[in-house]
Amino acid sequence: MRFLVGAVLVVVLVACATAFESDAETFKSLVVEERKCHGDGSKGCATKPDDWCCKNTPCKCPAWSSTSECRCAMDCSRRCKGKRALLLPVETHRLLFPEQW
């Protein structure tokens, strides 16, 4: 019985780890996939970068947003390390884009 419970626990842990890895890849592809803003009054576009992004960072809309929900989708430059892109928590950004840290 103990062996069966242990085996089930291992299977569940492996399934969770695989699901998390798959979700992370999907999320990363969403973050990376982006399109240009139309600008002209769209929030966070053209004239004013999103507050969470570095100044002078080109702004784009994430692929899943409408133009009224633009966010600064470009990676923040190294000199602005610690800022967030796409309102991601710093730890999530660090996991998705380790080459920037």
Swiss-Prot record:
Coiled coil: none
Entry's localization field: Secreted
One Gene Ontology term of the molecular function aspect: ion channel regulator activity
Disulfide bond as UniProt keyword: yes
Residue stretch(es) of the prosequence: 20-35, 85-101
Signal sequence extent: 1-19
GO cellular component: extracellular region
Predominant localisation class: secreted
Modified-residue entries (Lysine amide), positions: K81
Disulfide cysteine pairs (residue numbers): C37-C54, C45-C59, C53-C72, C61-C70
Keyword line: Amidation, Cleavage on pair of basic residues, Disulfide bond, Ion channel impairing toxin, Knottin, Neurotoxin, Secreted, Signal, Toxin
Functional description taken from the UniProt entry: Toxin active against insects (S.frugiperda larvae). May act on sodium (Nav) or calcium channels (Cav).
Entry domain remark: The presence of a 'disulfide through disulfide knot' structurally defines this protein as a knottin.
Family that this chain belongs to: Belongs to the neurotoxin 28 (Litx) family.
Protein name per Swiss-Prot or TrEMBL: U1-sicaritoxin-Li1a
Biological source species: Loxosceles intermedia
Lineage, top ranks: Eukaryota, Metazoa, Ecdysozoa, Arthropoda, Chelicerata
